[in-house]
Structure formats: C-alpha cells, structure tokens
Amino acid sequence: MLKLNQKKLSYTFDRCQQCGICYAVCPENAISLSLRHDGLHDIKINAALCIACGKCVRSCPANKEYGYEGYFDGFAQKKYYLGYHADNRIRRESSSGGVCKTLIIDSLKNGMVDGAYSLKCTDSFPFAQGEFYTREHIPSLGDMPNSVYHSVMACTEIDRIQPCKRLMLVGTACQLRALNSIIKDKCDEVVRVCIFCKQQKTLDSTRFLAKMMGTSVPPNLKFRPRYRGDGWPGIVRVDGFELPYSRAAQIPFGKRLWTVPGCGICGDSFGMEAGADITLMDPWTICSHNELGETLVTVHTQKGDELLQQCVSLNLEPRSFSEVEPALSLKDVWRKQVTEPAYRGRPCKKRYVRAVRAERRQQRLLRMVVEMLPRLPIICYRTLAKLPDLRNRILK
C-alpha cells in the first residue's frame, strides 16, 4: 500500500495486495521489486527518482475503500451456472471444469472481445505473469496456468495491453481494481471476469504442502508446482509428489494461514465493487468428489451472461440461488467486510477488533506448530484443521 504525504512516497507492506501495478505505472522507474523468502515482494522506492506524481497511489487497489452497503441484497436474484468444458479430457485436467481459460479462448475466437489480459505460464518462479491476448494471439489451454496458490504480481505487464474496442480483464478483485485504473484510454468497453478470492497465499503455504508430501521447495525455487487438476477437487503436486487437494486446503485455507497481508483489507471477494460481470469460483459443499470438475459461475450483468452464452465450448447448467447458496461463502465474505476496518486501523465495533486479534493469535500459534515440528501424520493435520475457528466464533 502506497501513500503520498507532502510529496514523500511511503510503502506499507502489511497492507500490500501484491498486484504490482505501482511498479508498472511509475513513469520514472522509481519503484523496484525485491523478492522475499515467502515469495512476496517488497516495494522499494528510489526517492531520488520519484517525482511525486501520485500515479502509483491512485492505482493502488489497497487505497480504495468501500462501505459495502447493500452488497448482499441482490444475490437471490442473480443467475448461477455450473459450467465446464464440453471436452471431458480438458474438463478433467483443468482446475475446476476449465471455464476461465475457455472464456478467454472462445471470446477471442468468436469476436466477443478483441483483447484479453490474464496470465501466461512461465518457466521460473512464480511460474506465471501477466499477458495480453488478441484475436491474432489466441492462447492455447496449455499457455495459461491452472489456479496458482502462491502470489503472482499479475499487473506488472500492463504495458502489453494495446488499444482495442472490447477488452476482457481476468483477475481477483484487487487485480481488477488495479487494472481499472489504467484502462481508460485502452478500450471502448470492458468485460470483467473475477476469480473469487478470500485469501491469496504466500510461498510458505506451498512449502507446508511440500512438507506434508515428504518433499521440500528448494532454496533456488527451481521446482514445479501444480495446484489443481485431475478432477474435482483435484490433486496438488510438487515435483512429482502429490496430495489430494481436499486435504491440502484444510490447513492453509481452512485456517487462513500464510495469507498475503493485504487480503485483510479486502472484503470484495466477488469483485462487484470492481465492476465484475461474472465471478468464477469452486463449488464447495454443493458438488461431491468426481473425476471431471465444474466451476460455479455467478452472473452479475447481462453483458456477463451474453459472454457466457457465446462460448460454444462451455456447457452451462442453470442453478437456483437456494441450490448454490452454501457454496457462495456469503457469511465468510461478510466476516471479511466487517473486520476490514480493524485491519486498516479504522474505528469499528469492539467485537470486530477482538475477532481480528483472536484470528492473528490463532494463526501465529498454528503456524508455529506446523512449521517447527517435523512432518506429522496426516491425521494430525486433520485434527488441527478441526480446531474451533476463534474469529468465526466471535463473529457468529
């Protein structure tokens, strides 16, 4: 998170959402990135080069605060689908049905959009970076990564975005907010696809998963992670070692460990405040284990629905709000929203402050246990995952 005070630029790591937009928009190259051991980046400011123009501050998504009034009012009226690729092989190999990649490819092929900014696979850590695709540069399924459960600075390559009539932006809510700040002169119309997100992960989360598998992430970061694929909910792999994702997610995601610090100041998991037309998420609790996979799609706008209907490679099964409500995590999103002021240091109800303090204490304790002890039997991790969630108990 960047602030400009009396022409002096300052950076707060604990509120940084790791999008990389500040690095990309700086006209004087006064901002550089320094990789940390946990896979995140520190933002370094060269005061001698900084001209205090404020572009980085205006683009920073962490500086955008919302009240979230009425956020949940329209969910009962929205359209919902379980979506998946028509080809079962592709469906199985994707994170959860292959909807996101297929949206990008089909929308470019059928002319629904002229350009799309998303991610591409790379050979070195973090194994993904931002990429601009066009109707002349349509990616294959293998060009784009499956879900990546360590932080990727998705907005560092925005200079690749060329002017076009209709632009698709794909990313989490914070990434969409960052991209919104720079697209004014890039296109006539924008279609936004939000990847539902309550928490991004540091590389320490992957280190823990590797430990569970009986391997490790090498210090030089020359390894190959694959976080999803092979049906629903899929398999996590690190250099040939593997673990069912349902087990792998219990500690990092279930207990919110190794979370990017700036995630605490974002309660817009669906990207609605960023203007999302559709949101893609995993169908937890409403879909059982299967060999193929599907994505839960929440439609926010008619434009988003039209985009979906034009994707000939997708199968879309309509669902009612009552059918999908358990998977939407609305209660958990509410918890993020009410605790956001406490994470920002703003005045709020004492109960919310108490919940954040309890959450931090529990996270520190659990991290100490699982990081300091040697590899434990799976049953021990499952037991830890079932410990009462102190934050949620306070925020019943």
List PLM regions with ranges:
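Iron-sulfur cluster-binding cysteine motifs and their immediate structural context
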Residues: 2, 15-17, 21-42, 55-74, ...
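Short, surface-exposed basic-aromatic patches at helix termini and helix-loop junctions that form
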Residues: 180-191, 210-214
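Gly/Ser/Thr-rich loops at beta-strand to alpha-helix junctions
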Residues: 94-99, 123, 169-179, 199-201
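Short, flexible loop segments at boundaries between secondary-structure elements
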Residues: 191-212, 326
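Flanking helices and flexible, charged tails adjoining ferredoxin-like Fe-S electron-transfer domains
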Residues: 1-6, 49-163, 326-344, 352-358
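Short, intrinsically disordered, charge-biased short linear motifs at domain edges
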Residues: 2-6, 10-13, 44-48, 246-254
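Generic beta-sheet signal
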Residues: 165-171, 190
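Long, compositionally biased charged/polar accessory segments in the mid-to-C-terminal portions
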Residues: 113-114, 213-396
